[in-house]
Design a protein with these regions (language model features):
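Short, conserved active-site loops that position catalytic residues or coordinate cofactors/metal ions
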Residues: 1-10
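Conserved beta-strand positions that form and line the central face of beta-propeller blades
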Residues: 9, 59, 181
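CN hydrolase (nitrilase-like) catalytic-core segments centered on the catalytic cysteine
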Residues: 14-33, 99-189
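Active-site/binding-pocket entry motifs
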Residues: 38, 65-66, 152, 197
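C-terminal beta-strand edge segments of enzyme domains
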Residues: 150-244
């Protein structure tokens, strides 16, 4: 059971944090997105929730689990993208490692997302990747990207060594311009965004109309076949190792 990895005190703290986000969205008439662990049955998910004026309006379970830090041993992967209409625009929601997989942000683009929100726990050692990937996703999908990263230190689940987290929250517009960044401390990063810039960029550079799904369909099928073959080979080797 995944739940043996976590204690009751942790889930109580998570519940308090979620209540705080809900209250914050109500008190300030805001849309708030935050991520934490979620228990359902015998499974634990890394889940982002979207609150609007004190109401939970959407949730997203992280699809891409971070295997280098053995996240897949402690959490179950989600299987449903999240795109939701809010008072501030149509949001696509990702979590941390998801940003490395362009297929998911592109799905949000297909579904008309205007803003991509990415809560993360991205370490200082790879902070350049965080900054570059957020900006790339904004440019290639012609939308705003809001990345929120943690600060402080925490031990790696895999090695036990402490990792530092730089904060480095940022707001990026559809042209790739960085509108605001954090300073490394816990706090708020703010910027005024104009959604008409999304429509303008998509008119000037009509990526949607120039897509070639007829080509991608076959390419994705080949990728799927290779991944399936690799998984079968890995399972076969594991079974052989167990017998020997």
């Amino acid at each position: 059971s995944f739940l043996t990895e976590f204690d009751d005190a942790l889930f109580e703290a998570v519940g308090d944090a979620e209540s705080s986000l809900c209250d914050l969205s109500r008190e300030h008439s805001m849309v708030v997105v935050g991520s934490s662990i979620e228990a359902e049955g015998d499974h634990v998910y890394n889940t982002a929730r979207v609150y609007q004026r004190g109401e939970l309006i959407a949730s997203y379970r992280k699809i891409h689990l971070f295997s280098p830090n053995v996240e897949h041993r402690h959490h179950e992967a989600g299987d449903q993208p999240c795109i939701v209409d809010t008072e501030v625009g149509r949001l696509g929601v990702l979590i941390c490692y998801d940003i490395r997989f362009p297929e998911l942000p592109r799905h949000c683009f297909y579904e008309g997302a205007e803003i991509l929100v990415v809560p993360g726990q991205w370490p200082e050692a790879r902070s350049q990747h965080w900054r570059t990937l957020l900006r790339a996703r904004a440019i290639e999908n012609e939308l705003f990207v809001i990345g929120c990263n943690r600060t402080g230190q925490e031990a790696s689940l895999r090695t036990g060594e402490a990792a530092s987290f730089p904060g480095d929250g940022r707001i990026i517009d559809p042209t790739g311009e960085i509108l605001a960044t954090g300073n490394g401390d816990a706090g708020a990063v703010t910027a005024l965004i104009e959604l008409r810039k999304v429509r303008t960029m998509r008119r000037i550079l009509p990526v949607a109309s120039d897509l070639r799904p007829d080509i991608y369909r076959d390419l994705l099928r080949r990728v799927h076949d290779k991944v399936d073959a690799g998984t079968r080979d890995k399972q076969a080797r594991s079974s052989l190792d167990e017998r020997t």
